[in-house]
Amino acid sequence: MTYIETLNWIHSHKANGRRPSLERMRYLLNLLDNPQDKFPAVHVVGTNGKGSTTSFLQHILTASSYKTGTFTSPFITRFNERIAIDGKEISDSNLVKTAQAIKPIVDSNVFQEKVGKVTEFELVTALMFCYFATINPIDVAVIEAGIGG
């Protein structure tokens, strides 16, 4: 897959009336060997200030010599901004590599028959967990709530 093909694949998972599902996420993450359990995380929630708080925490942790992953939404100019390590967005090649690692599971008929097609938000969340756990392992993540603040 190319970078553009990867973005098109991600964006092809629009919710179209489907709601994000904790059951679907648990099932997917279990099939991916629970990457979310491979590192500690701070979950930033609330009505206002999530982006600023995420940025402050990332800078503090990085300055303290922790390899710090951040997950934010929405992106401002480039999709890759959503997933970053120590303030540097995921590279095009690492986004492709991470997507290729989970695509066979996400696109399998067995998966979709069991829990349905993932939403774009679920897919991007799974990409982030896999990237931080296996492709470019981190010490800690700062994860901004993307739905329901």
Regions found by a protein language model. Name each.
Residues 29, 34-37, 63-149:
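ATP-dependent carboxylate-amine ligase catalytic core
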Residues 46-49, 144:
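Conserved phosphate-binding and hydrolysis motifs of nucleotide-dependent enzymes
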Residues 1-46, 53-66, 71, 110-116:
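Short functional linear segments
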Residues 20-23, 52, 90-93, 97:
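Conserved active-site and cofactor/substrate-binding residues in soluble primary-metabolism enzymes
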Residues 48-50, 75-76:
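Short active-site-proximal "capping" loops at secondary-structure junctions
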